[in-house]
Design a protein with these regions (language model features):
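C-terminal coupling/interaction segments
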Residues: 2-4, 261-306
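Conserved structural motif at the start of ABC-family nucleotide-binding domains
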Residues: 10, 25-27
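The feature captures the beta-strand-to-loop junction immediately N-terminal to the Walker
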Residues: 41-43
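Conserved ABC transporter NBD signature motif
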Residues: 56, 64-74, 78
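Conserved ABC ATPase "signature" region
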Residues: 102, 106, 112-127
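Catalytic Walker B motif of ABC-type/P-loop ATPase nucleotide-binding domains
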Residues: 155-159
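ABC transporter nucleotide-binding domain
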Residues: 173-261
Length: 306
């Protein structure tokens, strides 16, 4: 990503969206820049898929407006420059993988060769298989292929690696990163923190219908005034949750990960609780820690304002 300002590709301006009496977004402002991967994070129901739906024209805002390349999302000039991979999406069951990609690519003036798309999506070996005979992860790869086949300037990916094995996830990350480096704006809605950290130039955290944090991954993690301590101990997690400054305790294999705002007192108390403790590691807060902390703080603010 360039250090200079990049052109704004897409924007939500004062967007409000409700489902019945439940307002998911309210006065929501959001913009995507060329050459940048923006990860949209938040708890379940925060509105990540709604943002993706509004940007792609699958949903209409109740208030406010959506602009893609200066147009409404329904405008042909906007749709021709966009690639979409949403959570829900069917495939033409009777077509082979290659036929489905070739058919979809035909709608775009800047289509990539079908063989290139299949290679980038990890589908070369499945080119001749019918779409109704694909596994869930294989079908998601085809949906990714359909999203990239038209050389999009805006790529919207909603939970793209669901059903992928680790190697397939990393391969997709490489392709997405290359698209952004070539100038595309990428919106990544995901609940995988490692995916966000691996890909994102910018992270936007949403909760309660609004943006509660926006910045590079390092800046988002720095918002947590806490330290992570990994301990190898025979004691149960419950023994550590009551210690001063402890925000969160979770079990990771044979270890406990303790997130604390008071690392020295926490370590001293840990040694007092378990004199046999010899293995520990002190690190900064993770992106997952930061997300949990930001969302929790937002809930507290909303309760106090009610």
């Amino acid at each position: 990503m360039s250090s200079t300002a990049s052109p704004v590709i897409a924007a939500l301006e004062g967007a409000t969206k409700a489902y019945g009496a439940h307002r998911v977004l309210e006065g929501f402002d959001f913009a995507l820049e060329a050459g940048t991967v923006t990860a949209l994070l938040g708890p379940n129901g925060a509105g990540k898929s709604t943002v993706a739906g509004l940007l792609t024209g699958r949903l209409l805002p109740d208030e406010g407006r959506v602009r893609l390349f200066g147009h409404d999302p329904s405008h042909q000039l906007a749709r021709a420059r966009m690639g979409i991979m949403l959570q829900a999406g069917g495939l033409p069951e009777t077509l082979t993988v290659a036929e489905a990609v070739d058919l979809h690519a035909g709608y775009f003036a800047r289509r990539l060769p079908t063989a290139m798309v299949l290679e980038q999506a990890g589908l070369t070996a499945l080119a001749g298989r019918r779409c109704d005979r694909l596994s869930g992860g294989e079908a998601r790869k085809v949906q990714f292929a359909l999203a990239i086949c038209g050389t999009p300037d805006l790529l919207v990916l909603d939970e793209p690696t669901t059903g992928f094995d680790p190697d397939a996830r990393r391969a997709m990350w490489d392709v997405v990163r290359a698209k952004a480096d070539a100038g595309a704006a990428v919106l990544l809605a995901t609940h995988h923190m490692d995916e966000a950290e691996a890909l994102a130039d910018r992270i936007v955290v949403i909760a309660g219908g609004r943006v509660i944090a926006d910045g590079p991954p390092a800046a988002i993690k720095a918002k947590v005034a806490a330290t992570a301590i990994r301990l190898r101990t025979r004691l149960a997690a419950e023994r550590f949750r009551a210690l001063p400054g402890v925000v969160k305790v979770e079990t990771i294999g044979a270890d406990l990960s303790v997130l604390t705002t008071a690392p020295r007192p926490t370590l001293e108390a840990a040694f007092a609780l378990d004199p046999a403790l010899v293995h520990f590691e002190v690190t900064g807060a993770s992106l997952e820690d930061a997300l949990a902390n930001l969302v929790s703080a937002n809930r507290t603010i909303l309760k106090e304002a009610a």
